């Protein structure tokens, strides 16, 4: 956060919305992480802001995706790290005991989606530089955590296996573990 300048804006007031619109008119990127539909309900949807600035890259982290880019029965649900870890499946493969879900130490449900969103933002900014056209970019926290479980998804999809907690072991590599 070096050299970062922060402001607080009340988005529920017309004055606050006017400030956002004025900032967006000059901005390259807007990042938000409200539930799907929140900014739309405030009159600050991607579509309305893109009218003010066609080069705008509007980036959103959602718990379970955005209706603009796909459908999810959970799209309206709020989410945070531990919810993303549980729904994404990583808690089911972490720790030593089956039946006792364990969250991963770091907040991967928050940080991994943010890193993936950064990649999307960089690509969209590059596109805007070349074409003058902004984009809506979103990352679902659920999808990002599920991507961390890629081997488990393949095991289930192709072999019908339901992977469980592995502790310090690895089901495919040997020797593998903690040795003193």
Give residue spans per PLM region.
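A structured beta-alpha segment of the ubiquitous adenosine-cofactor-binding alpha/beta core
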Residues: 1-51
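A contiguous active-site-proximal alpha/beta segment in oxidoreductase catalytic domains
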Residues: 3, 29, 82, 111, ...
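Hydrophobic/aromatic beta-strand patches that form the interior of the parallel beta-sheet core
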Residues: 7, 57-59, 137
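Residues at the C-termini of beta-strands that transition into short coil/loop
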Residues: 10, 62, 143
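Rossmann-fold NAD(P)-binding glycine/threonine-rich loop
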Residues: 36, 40-94
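Acidic, glycine-rich segments within the central catalytic cores of soluble metabolic enzymes
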Residues: 85-180
């Amino acid at each position: 956060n070096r050299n970062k300048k922060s402001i607080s804006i009340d988005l529920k007031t017309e004055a606050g919305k006017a400030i956002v619109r004025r900032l967006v008119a000059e901005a390259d990127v807007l990042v938000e992480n409200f539930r799907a539909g929140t900014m739309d309900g405030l009159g600050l949807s991607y579509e309305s802001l893109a009218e003010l600035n066609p080069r705008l890259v509007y980036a959103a982290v959602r718990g379970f995706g955005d209706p603009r880019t796909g459908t999810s029965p959970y799209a309206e649900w709020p989410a945070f790290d531990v919810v993303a870890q549980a729904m994404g499946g990583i808690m089911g493969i972490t720790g030593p005991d089956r039946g006792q879900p364990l969250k991963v130490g770091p907040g991967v449900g928050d940080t991994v989606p943010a890193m993936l969103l950064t990649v999307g933002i960089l690509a969209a900014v590059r596109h805007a530089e070349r074409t003058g056209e902004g984009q809506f970019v979103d990352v679902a926290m659920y999808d990002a955590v599920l991507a961390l479980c890629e081997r488990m998804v393949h095991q289930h999809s192709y072999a019908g296996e339901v992977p469980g907690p592995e502790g310090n072991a690895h089901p495919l590599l040997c020797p593998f573990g903690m040795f003193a």
